[in-house]
UniProtKB/Swiss-Prot annotation:
InterPro entries: GPCR_Rhodpsn (IPR000276), GPCR_Rhodpsn_7TM (IPR017452), GPR40-rel_orph (IPR013312), GPR40_recept_FA (IPR013313)
Glycosylated residues, chain numbering: N152
Name of the protein: Free fatty acid receptor 1
Extracellular side: 1-8, 65-79, 143-178, 249-256
Protein localization: Cell membrane
Domain of life (superkingdom): Eukaryota
Organism from which the protein derives: Mesocricetus auratus (Golden hamster)
UniProt family annotation: Belongs to the G-protein coupled receptor 1 family.
């Protein structure tokens, strides 16, 4: 299904207009709560919101690029910077959502054991590891696949390429023989692994909630807190990464599906702040996952 450039433009602009202020509010709310008590989930939320803020900043460029039918609108040397700032948060977001889900699952299934070892400094270490994994993998793959450098105008370049119509294109003119395996490796390591972790933790949270003493209403709230990350991964990041797999299996399936996947991925900047639930400016408000077990209560 092919969408018009005007519709792509409108979707990118809408994602930016909603996602940018939402993530600013999420950061504000998380910082306000962290001043009272810093928890592992607050650390993950802050990194996720900052990551989404970076992604949101690039969306106006994607909007102009879409309106120009893929032509690169900025000076040529900014292409590699844009690729890094746009795609690193897109892949890192899955890791932060998986970390949030793991924290909720461990708190629900093993409240006392997890309470004894949950320390914010461990969460900072996890976040640094996620960023390092994403950036190192991107640098390694992109560096190996660009033997002539980012601004080489050959067909194997990852950066600027000049197609037949004479307009410069950033990244999308990447040689398909190099792009397909590279994008597949990104998706397997940085999406499908976090997706499996998130799905496992979601099922574990549901089992723990089923045996908890919470009311039906609070069970629904806790189930949303646990399942929101899984839904965001599926709905926002799933189509883009599915297109990477599809284009590897059948090269003819990649083009328009990938463009749609980038659109849904951009809307993760809108859904993620709603999933984390730290939009309120007041430290005393916000959606938290609270699980009451046989011997006590744990709050994350």
């Amino acid at each position: 299904m092919a969408l018009s450039p005007q519709l792509f433009f409108a979707l990118y602009v809408s994602a930016f207009a909603l996602g940018f202020p939402l993530n600013l509010l999420a950061i504000r709310g998380a910082v306000a709560r962290a001043r009272l008590r810093l928890t592992p989930n607050l650390v993950y939320t802050l990194h996720l919101a900052c990551s989404d803020l970076l992604l949101a900043i690039t969306l106006p460029v994607k909007a102009v690029e879409a309106l120009a039918s893929g032509a690169w609108p900025l000076p040529l040397p900014l292409c590699p910077v844009f690729v890094l700032v746009h795609f690193a948060p897109l892949y890192a977001g899955g890791g932060f959502l998986a970390a949030l889900s793991a924290g909720r699952y461990l708190g629900a299934a093993f409240p006392f054991g997890y309470q004894a070892v949950r320390r914010p400094r461990y969460s900072w270490g996890v976040c640094v590891a996620i960023w390092a994994l994403v950036l190192c993998h991107m640098g390694l793959v992109l560096g190996l696949e660009a033997p002539g450098g980012w601004l080489n105008t050959t067909s194997s370049s990852l950066g600027i390429n000049t197609p037949v119509n004479g307009s410069p294109v950033c990244l999308e003119a990447w040689d398909p023989n190099s792009a397909r395996p590279a994008r597949l490796s990104f998706s397997i390591l940085l999406f499908f692994v976090p997706l499996v972790i998130t799905a496992f933790c979601y099922v574990g949270c549901l089992r723990a909630l089923a045996h908890s003493g919470l009311s039906h209403k609070r069970k629904l709230r806790a189930a949303w807190a646990a399942g929101g990350a899984f839904l965001t991964l599926l709905l926002c990041l799933g189509p883009y990464n599915a297109s990477n797999v599809a284009s590897f299996v059948n090269p003819d399936l990649g083009g328009s599906w990938r463009k749609l996947g980038l659109i849904t991925g951009s809307w993760s900047v809108v859904l993620n702040p709603l999933v984390t639930g730290y939009l309120g400016a007041s430290p005393g408000r916000g959606t938290v996952c609270t699980t009451r077990t046989q011997g006590g209560t744990i709050q994350k």
